[in-house]
Amino acid sequence: MLERIQQLVNAVNDPRSDVATKRQAIELLNGIKSSENALEIFISLVINENSNDLLKFYGLSTLIELMTEGVNANPNGLNLVKFEITKWLKFQVLGNKQTKLPDFLMNKISEVLTTLFMLMYSDCNGNQWNSFFDDLMSLFQVDSAISNTSPSTDGNILLGLEFFNKLCLMINSEIADQSFIRSKESQLKNNNIKDWMRDNDIMKLSNVWFQCLKLDEQIVSQCPGLINSTLDCIGSFISWIDINLIIDANNYYLQLIYKFLNLKETKISCYNCILAIISKKMKPMDKLAFLNMINLTNELTYYHQAISMNPQIITFDNLEVWESLTKLITSFGIEFTIIIEQVNDDQKLDTLYKQSVISNVDSILLEKIIPILLEFMNNEFDSITAKTFPFWSNYLAFLKKYKASSPNFVPLHKDFLDNFQQICFKRMKFSDDEVTQDDFEEFNETVRFKLKNFQEIIVVIDPSLFLNNISQEISANLMNCKNESWQIFELTIYQIFNLSECTKNNYFGLNKNEIMTSQPSLTLVRFLNELLMMKDFLLAIDNEQIQILFMELIVKNYNFIFSTSANTANATDDDEKYLLILNIFMSSFAMFNKRENVRLRSWYLFTRFLKLTRINLKKILFANKNLVNEITNKISPLLHIKVTSINAQGTDDNDTIFDNQLYIFEGIGFIITLNNSSQELTAATANTPIDYDILDQILTPLFTQLEGCITQGASPVVILECHHILMAIGTLARGLHIGLVPENQVNNMVVNKKLINDSLIHKFSNIAEVILVTFSFFNKFENIRDASRFTFARLIPILSNKILPFINKLIELILSSTDLKSWEMIDFLGFLSQLIHMFHTDTDCYQLFNQLLTPLINKVHSIIEEIDEQHDQQSSSNKPIDTAVTATSVNKNIVVTDSYRDKILLKKAYCTFLQSFTNNSVTSILLSDINRAILPVILNDLVTYTPQEIQETSMMKVSLNVLCNFIKCFGNGTCLDNDDINKDPNLKIDGLNEYFIMKCVPIIFEIPFNPIYKFNIKEGNFKTMAYDLARLLRELFIVSSNPTTNENECVKYLTQIYLPQIQLPQELTIQLVNMLTTMGQKQFEKWFVDNFISVLKQGQ
């Protein structure tokens, strides 16, 4: 049998075995595991001398698996494993063997023993092996090992003692490690085991560790892992055992620990052990007494002196050791800050006593701990610096909170704050080791951003100190930057940036109306001006960090650059500064930079700067008639669109470049129309001739390129090139629009019509023609359809209703596409909703949609049917479907496939489109003769839902709102919307009211109460849906009222047909009808949800 297992295990682990062979071997091994004598078989596999390490490992792993199963976890089986494994282990560890077991096997043995411990130790396990620790101490001759201080002690005995410690560590990890989430039952069992250990074994273990720490140094050097495992044990167990077992009155135990602080092999374990000890939870005053008693600061004085005298003492070789030490000292300081917080929050303590304790703790920090941590923070290794950050966060928060408690509080800390800020300045600088973008990003994330946050807290604590220090730092660097490294200049710009952030966010605590004239603002303006006057030096710099940071600084602080306080005697005027900034952007420093990341970022920032400084730019364009031509000529090389290759997805390998190139098109469009809008000073109306010929300089190359694409035919590269050109034209149109119309008026058609000139309309009519010609050639390609919709959406505000003839053709071409994707239809429906909103009062638009509605609805249904067919085909052919299981709040799992997701999104977009008819008062379209045949289809879509769709609450909300509004607008068969200018008062559709009643009433009651819908009224989204259902019932009641006969068809249907049919009690029926007929809208909705649905749901 053992040979057979060996063959199977080898087959499973052999990389040359095929999948079928491995699967068969695993099945056979599982069969052996399920046999009655499985424990005996795998014990034999472990202890057999002929078993190799792989077989032993597999055997031990299987024993763990078998012991944790209910069938084998019986006293006889556990005792068998206990007896055989401990006997074999004694020979392996203590026998005079030349080769010891590898670590991975020893760890697995520890896991077996830990499993036995968890199943047999303490009264919660039936007291099966309460002598666990005694037996293993005897097995490994622990008493002999710790009582023999002779250097000739048997090495195997020491190894056995080390193994015993590691076993204790694994047990502690199982019962006390807080990083694992355990069940309540498991936690109670672990607590029971810990209580049992406290009562019976912890003192023995503590004594073992104590004796280990007393061993002769030669023995320690013979087996350094023994001391490390001992220290690890103390650090691991200290969180839940009595502290007095480790800390005695004479600190003898602790002194034994301290003696390993300076041993190379034990330093890290010693630091971690002390860290765990000082982190032991105690009451604040007990903790303060404890921290003072252990006298750790005296033990650490050596390290403070060492690093102060020789910072280079920390090297890559010993970095891990120093990181552990830094973490220890940081944690030591944090414990004192926690004491401060706890004392301050204790309501029982006297105020004067609190202040005394806080002052005492603060003095300890300032005198003994902070000087050491400042040295570590100032170290050149980022990892050392970062280890100190948790303490600074706590301590600066303490200073910020208590700065107002005493007039002398801040002055007492001024030296610290001054030193701390100076170190922040130094450690913010990039080092020579940071050479790649990844290096810079890592430094920013781990060090610089945190130091920036610390600076911001210092501003709040002592504004004058911060402003004085940062001003001196920036001034000195600006003065000497030409002789310094690039890192110094980059840091200078970064600190100016930080000063601006502190000023804009008002960390200085100024009145809002004083910020722009305050000293921080004046200082910032001075630095920005000095930086701009260094143009020649800037342009000569070839460093991407500086180039990007400078542009970001200028764009984000434009308001300071052009503020009234910026016009000092030494500063150039606004126009000159503006032109200076433009020239910097349009140079090799920025937009023509040889580095792609700088170039692309500058394209965005250039356009952002133009839009932010709209008023300044408009003034300059009015004074400089040829400026727009100069700018266009300079950046025209960047407007050329080129597709060199495409990837497997059919997109450009340089898509990122094109996406950023669109910012330039937007920016140049913005400048062109802003230039012409500046002529408002002399032009009275939108019809005054204004020259837009400069547009031809941009559009003509694009049109020529499009013509070439049409001539070449539909290759993938040509199609992508056409897509890019159309997107560029649409983005140019967006820039032209926002340059001409104020930002807060871009959607106001009246303002648009007034400000947009006829000459611009003429040019964009030509653009619309070109787009339609291109689209007609390539309309079967979805990215062309996407780009065409995008561009037409940007032309609408400019052409207004003059775009409708073009839109008509566009819609026809899109609907004629045979391969229209669901996401395209979603976008298209949104596009059409925008048209309805903008032109709902236009007769031509009304006629357009009157003709469009039926084919559009048919197209939506066609796509939904295609989605359903695709899903059915995948299911029937067992093809893999991209799925995700979504657990809803009502604990109903819905399998969400791509097709299901597409269908839900399309239905939501469809309902939103229908909503646009009611929102814009054009519901009469739905009642017209031409659309009367499609109306039943639309209404059926709104009253038919699957159980899965009910769970899609966002879609249901839109759908129910549309249904409510339809009932409100034409629920009795006639158009009831008085704002609908196209309604026919003589038109009525008979039977529509009865249809709404018979279809909607069942929905109102079935959705909340039918179990298949899993309607959870306690969940927020479903409660909102319940309010929508109440509104639906109320709208039915209102529209069904007949003032002539005083009858209500809705009430009639409820009381005589539906409610008796579902066997609603008579008293509830009377109450419901009474509330429906007497309450207002909001009152009835609240009653229906809280007192009808919620109450009845409780009885289900």
Curated annotation (Swiss-Prot):
The keyword RNA-binding applies. Transmembrane segments: none annotated. One of its GO terms (cellular component) is nuclear pore. Its main location: nucleus. Gene3D superfamilies: Leucine-rich Repeat Variant (1.25.10.10). tRNA nucleus export receptor which facilitates tRNA translocation across the nuclear pore complex. Preferentially interacts with tRNAs with mature 5'- and 3'-termini and does not distinguish between intron-containing and spliced tRNAs. In the nucleus binds to tRNA and to the Ran-GTPases GSP1 or GSP2 in their active GTP-bound form. Docking of this trimeric complex to the nuclear pore complex (NPC) is mediated through binding to nucleoporins. Interacts with CEX1, GSP1, GSP2, NSP1, NUP2 and UTP8. This is Exportin-T. The lineage of its organism: Eukaryota, Fungi, Dikarya, Ascomycota, Saccharomycotina. The gene is LOS1.
